[in-house]
Amino acid sequence: ANALYLVNLDTVPVVAFATGHSEAITTSTSTSFTGLLNDNNFEVKEFNMLTDEIPEDASIVVLGMPTTDYTSEELSKLEAYLGDEKMASSRTLYVMTAPNAGWSSMPNLSSFLAEWGMEPQSQEVLESNTNNTLYNMPYAIFANVTDSVLSKTYDNVVKVQAAPVKRLFTANNDISTYSVIETSDTAYLSNDEKVLETPETDTYTILAFAQRYMDNQGKICANVVVDGCAADFYDGSSLLGNSTFGNKDVTLDLIKNLTGTTDTRVGLTVNQTQTNTMDISASSAVTWSIGMMLFTIVVPVAVLVIGLVIFLRRRHL
């Protein structure tokens, strides 16, 4: 049925995955995410950032947790992509990251993101209040979706082993930054050097968003997103494919917001999230079983795999 809508679209939004930097998240390791995009009539492409040009029709360029730094030539490509004043629609750079992603070894890409007011951190966000965790696991956090970009209310959005993203400014010249997904004020950051009995708690941004208007009406924008929870997109996590959690709805709504598409123009398989409820369709026993499988087996394995990929690729540099 979705194919019928493609006939009526002037253009099909394209999400292009960049390769060439030993990315942990690619089209082959994030089939749940790419399947979600395809089901909602987004076209998925892949290109090599070093040897290829960025696809001209790309609405979103994904950097799926790169593990090596970008060259000045590659960053010039990204600058040209985002800075094209003749663009017919909004464009977005979507950067995925995770704890211990090795940003200290990527100074060029870090500086590029800093110009957009965002700095990925290498620590892990943990939760001190068990009421804000799933099954008392401090690394499985019930996160809050702010109304700065998305206007709906989302329930059961869980972020597992996420890294914080520091906003360097709220507004600077023509760039504004926003916190889209964040923790409660009882979260704290991991410290590998020592375990603190009373850690300092605060609210931390997990997904940050920067925007620059490219026209006088604010209808065409250049956007940069830094998402500290790359585990969401890895096939082993299953978070995007499980309707118990709100991750799928948040992700799809954000992608549609970034591309300027709506439910009526793109796709038919849009599951609207219940607002102001905690309505989980499964029984408590079934939900408990799903949760335990996800967060004691599936997600830890997924994160370990991502970590192993990063380690092995860096070892062979």
Regions found by a protein language model. Name each.
Residues 1-317:
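Short, surface-exposed patches at the edges or C-terminal ends of soluble domains, predominantly
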